C-alpha cells in the first residue's frame, strides 16, 4: 500500500510539473493581458515595419517577421534561466511569428516593467539603451501603423 501511494504521489508530481511547463509560454501572454497593455497591436505594427509581415525575411543577422538577432535570443534564454524556466529559444524560433511574439513579451516583462509602449518600440529598434533621437523615425513609423 505504501509503495502504491508513493507511485501515485510521484505520478501526480510529474503531472503537475508537466502542466506548469506547458503553460510557461501562455503565462507571458496572460501577464501581458493583465498588465493593461494590449501588446498585439504594437507587435503587429513592429512586424509590418520590420519585415512587412514576412516570417522568412532576412537582413544581416536579423531574421523573421520581427527581425530578431542572435543576441536577442541569447538574452531571452538568459532571462528564462534567471527565472529558473527550462524553456529555451533556438535560432530557428526567430522564423516563427508566435515564438517571436513570445520573445518580445519576455523582453518587455524583463526590461520594460512599466509597460511603456514608447519604450517597447524604441528599445526594439535601438536596444535597451536606445537613443531617442536615433529611434525617432522608427517610432513614428510604428505609431502610424497603430492608428
PLM feature spans:
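Catalytic glycan-binding domains that act on GlcNAc-containing polysaccharides
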Residues: 25-147
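N-terminal amphipathic/basic-hydrophobic helices that include classical n-h-c signal peptides
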Residues: 1-2, 121
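Sec/Tat signal peptide C-region and signal peptidase I cleavage site
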Residues: 20-24
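Bacterial N-terminal signal peptides that target proteins for export
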Residues: 2-12
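Bacterial N-terminal signal peptides
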Residues: 11-19
Amino acid at each position: 500500500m505504501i509503495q502504491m501511494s508513493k507511485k501515485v504521489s510521484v505520478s501526480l508530481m510529474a503531472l503537475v510539473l508537466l502542466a506548469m511547463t506547458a503553460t510557461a509560454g501562455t503565462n507571458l501572454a496572460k501577464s501581458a493581458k493583465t498588465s493593461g497593455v494590449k501588446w498585439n497591436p504594437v507587435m503587429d505594427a513592429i512586424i509590418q515595419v520590420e519585415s512587412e509581415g514576412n516570417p522568412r525575411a532576412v537582413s544581416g543577422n536579423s531574421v523573421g517577421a520581427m527581425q530578431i538577432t542572435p543576441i536577442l535570443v541569447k538574452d531571452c534564454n538568459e532571462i528564462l534561466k534567471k527565472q529558473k524556466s527550462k524553456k529555451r529559444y533556438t535560432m530557428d524560433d526567430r522564423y516563427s511569428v508566435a515564438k517571436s511574439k513570445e520573445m518580445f513579451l519576455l523582453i518587455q516583462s524583463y526590461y520594460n516593467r512599466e509597460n511603456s509602449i514608447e519604450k517597447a518600440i524604441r528599445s526594439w529598434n535601438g536596444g535597451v539603451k536606445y537613443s531617442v533621437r536615433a529611434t525617432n523615425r522608427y517610432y513614428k513609423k510604428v505609431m502610424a501603423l497603430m492608428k
